[in-house]
From Swiss-Prot:
NCBIfam families: cyt_tran_rel, nicotinate (nicotinamide) nucleotide adenylyltransferase, PRK00071.1-3, PRK00071.1-4. It comes from Bacillus thuringiensis (strain Al Hakam). GO terms for molecular function: ATP binding; nicotinate-nucleotide adenylyltransferase activity. This is Probable nicotinate-nucleotide adenylyltransferase. HAMAP family: NaMN_adenylyltr. Belongs to the NadD family. PANTHER family: NICOTINATE-NUCLEOTIDE ADENYLYLTRANSFERASE-RELATED, PHOSPHOPANTETHEINE ADENYLYLTRANSFERASE. Catalyzes the reversible adenylation of nicotinate mononucleotide (NaMN) to nicotinic acid adenine dinucleotide (NaAD). It is an enzyme of class 2 (transferase).
């Protein structure tokens, strides 16, 4: 059975924290590859102004293109409405019955697991992999595999704020992503 990691998110913008997490879990669990799963509309972020799907996808392609064991899964972008992990993983497990999926989440989402849509059924579809995030714990009553990663306190919201304040973001996200953001005037206001 193939072992594939999935890291979901809005990737608004994608940054070195996302890449670090994906790479550390890839090596720690001896995965075949890691799929980045951009959300259409995450249920916990409904109502927030999110950058267009086209721009987020382009930035994610730029961020992941250098790693042959990273790819992008468009499953959630093909659906309208909120992106529920259960619905996505139900589709993916039917589409790829020979794959054992390892769904990678940060400490913030580990704490949020009790509120996930259809969590009990989702546990039958994936193995959750929790990685530490500053300010959050990995304690939960749900079964998760934990992977230690170097602490890197960067987030997409921090980067959007830094761009808005016209602060440097060098060394926080890939240079090609920075160039795309600047050329397209993203996060300026």
């Amino acid at each position: 059975m193939r072992k594939i990691g999935i890291i979901g998110g809005t990737f608004d913008p994608p940054h070195y924290g996302h890449l670090l997490i994906a790479n550390e879990v890839y090596h720690a669990l001896n995965l075949e590859e890691v799929w980045f799963l951009p959300n259409q509309i995450p249920p916990h972020k409904q109502g927030r102004n999110i950058t267009s799907v086209e721009s987020r996808l382009q930035m994610l392609e730029l961020a992941t293109e250098a790693e042959e064991h990273f790819s992008i899964c468009l499953e959630e972008l093909s659906r309208k409405g909120p992106s529920y992990t259960y619905d996505t993983m139900l589709q993916l497990t039917k589409k790829y019955p020979d794959v054992q999926f390892h769904f990678i989440i940060g400490g913030d989402m580990v704490e949020y697991l009790p509120k996930w849509y259809n969590i009990e059924a989702l546990l039958d579809l994936v193995t959750f992999v929790g990685v530490a995030r500053p300010g959050y714990t990995l304690h939960t009553s749900y079964p998760i595999t934990t992977v230690e990663i170097p602490e890197f306190a960067v987030s997409s919201s921090l980067l959007r704020e830094r761009y808005k304040e016209k602060k440097t973001c060098k060394y926080l996200l890939p240079e090609k992503v920075q160039v795309y953001i600047e050329r397209n005037g993203l996060y300026e206001s």
